[in-house]
Swiss-Prot record:
Coiled coil: none annotated. SUPFAM superfamilies: Ribosomal protein L1 (SSF56808). It comes from Geobacillus thermodenitrificans (strain NG80-2). Part of the 50S ribosomal subunit. Binds directly to 23S rRNA. The L1 stalk is quite mobile in the ribosome, and is involved in E site tRNA release. Protein L1 is also a translational repressor protein, it controls the translation of the L11 operon by binding to its mRNA. This is Large ribosomal subunit protein uL1.
Amino acid sequence: MPKRGKKYLEALKLVDRFKAYPVAEAIELVKKTNVAKFDATVEVAFRLGVDPKKADQQIRGAVVLPHGTGKVARVLVFAKGEKAKEAEAAGADYVGDTEYINKIQQGWFDFDVVVATPDMMGEVGKLGRILGPKGLMPNPKTGTVTFDVTKAVQEIKAGKVEYRVDKAGNIHVPIGKVSFDNEKLAENFATIYEAILKAKPAAAKGTYVKNVTITSTMGPGIKVDPTTVAVAQ
């Protein structure tokens, strides 16, 4: 385990690791325990009662946060003809087809999200082994395989985030920056929490949301009582 700095250890003293804090209080504590010298990202981690090894308990989706994440994503769109023009008009950073497939195969990754029209997926599929492990492969479940490229690009630019359960049953999602107003962080939290509740697989048994933790980059984790989310909104 890496050695923690003095500032981190001081911040840790402010947190009761056995307590699940109300959302509003947890957000305030995240700011107090932030030790980064930059505008740190605030992230929420959900530990879910699902078995990701089972196909009927996979959780994946996307949601537009009302106040964004504080980062404007660079969007690559695979499209041709009119759809390519629509993507450019919507604000996509890169639009094209085979030339970008070749660039990616050569190691180019100056983008954060990939969108593709369905007719391009035959070609984009060649990038599965490259984009898949990085979580960048377009997917209908996250709205990134679509003919409505205008909506897709605009939502991503507005603060759409993807969420996906990992092998351990956890979901990690950024909800903003420590510089955000507390109310905005709370509303973003409420939005992603509601989306994850709606995404509960029918096959999931027992307690669905087992644990929720909020943290800032380099800061300590703070347990959250998600049932207080209505109070925080």
